[in-house]
């Protein structure tokens, strides 16, 4: 999950510039995504998440351990692993964009809180993209127990990192 976890904060850190929706509105008269979703954020977030995943892949293929725990594998070979890592990183940001689209439809402005949805949107996106890219790997690695653990831990991690981002001036809201 590290590629998914890191793509969002790096999108916020390096984002800005031209919005993905180009300022266009949907048929309801509201912005499609809003100013918070930019090409620079999308590409830099995917790149940074992918890069973190590449480091994980490299370490796992070398048998690296932390406190006696092996690094997770992302596939039987480098190519398969890189596909999974890219799916996790890109899926996270597309999940976040999907959520933004629906928040705009609900009339919620950029930065408005939508509890649990704000914390788990990128997880769902990462899982969907990863399942589509590598279904066998996904099913064998994201067991119900692992998925439940991710669903429980992610909101706490998300809130913590957002508060840090708020205090260092990267985010406008602490959620």
From Swiss-Prot:
Main location: membrane
Keywords: Cell membrane, Lipid biosynthesis, Lipid metabolism, Magnesium, Membrane, Phospholipid biosynthesis, Phospholipid metabolism, Transferase, Transmembrane, Transmembrane helix
Biological pathway: Membrane lipid metabolism; glycerophospholipid metabolism
E.C. number: 2.7.7.67
Cofactor: Mg(2+)
Catalyses which reaction(s): 2,3-bis-O-(geranylgeranyl)-sn-glycerol 1-phosphate + CTP + H(+) = CDP-2,3-bis-O-(geranylgeranyl)-sn-glycerol + diphosphate
Keyword Transmembrane listed: yes
InterPro entries in the record: CarS, CarS_archaea
Any Gene Ontology biological process: glycerophospholipid biosynthetic process
One GO CC term, this protein: plasma membrane
Pfam families linked to this entry: CarS-like (PF01864)
Top-level lineage group: Archaea
Places the protein is found: Cell membrane
Sample GO molecular function, one term: CDP-2,3-bis-(O-geranylgeranyl)-sn-glycerol synthase activity
Recorded topology in the membrane: Multi-pass membrane protein
Transmembrane segments: 41-61, 82-102, 122-142, 150-170
PANTHER family linked: CDP-ARCHAEOL SYNTHASE
Role: Catalyzes the formation of CDP-2,3-bis-(O-geranylgeranyl)-sn-glycerol (CDP-archaeol) from 2,3-bis-(O-geranylgeranyl)-sn-glycerol 1-phosphate (DGGGP) and CTP. This reaction is the third ether-bond-formation step in the biosynthesis of archaeal membrane lipids.
Assigned protein family: Belongs to the CDP-archaeol synthase family.
Protein's name in the database: CDP-archaeol synthase
Lineage, uppermost ranks: Archaea, Methanobacteriati, Methanobacteriota, Stenosarchaea group, Methanomicrobia
Gene: carS
């Amino acid at each position: 999950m590290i590629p998914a976890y890191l793509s969002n904060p790096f999108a916020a850190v390096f984002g800005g510039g031209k919005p993905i929706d180009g300022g266009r509105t949907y048929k309801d008269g509201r912005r499609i995504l809003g100013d918070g979703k930019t090409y620079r954020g999308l590409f830099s977030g995917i790149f940074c998440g992918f890069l973190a995943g590449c480091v994980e892949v490299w370490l796992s293929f070398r048998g690296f351990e932390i406190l006696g725990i092996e690094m997770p594998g992302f596939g039987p070979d480098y190519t398969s692993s890189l596909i999974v890592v890219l799916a996790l990183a890109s899926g996270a940001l597309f999940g976040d964009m999907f959520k933004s689209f629906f928040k705009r439809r609900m009339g919620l402005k950029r930065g408005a809180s939508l509890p649990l949805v704000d914390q788990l949107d990128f997880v769902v996106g990462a899982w969907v993209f990863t399942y589509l890219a590598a279904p066998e790997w996904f099913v064998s690695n994201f067991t119900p127990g692992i998925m439940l653990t991710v669903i429980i831990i992610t909101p706490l991690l998300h809130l913590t990192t957002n508060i840090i981002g708020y205090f260092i001036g990267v985010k406008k809201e602490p959620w």
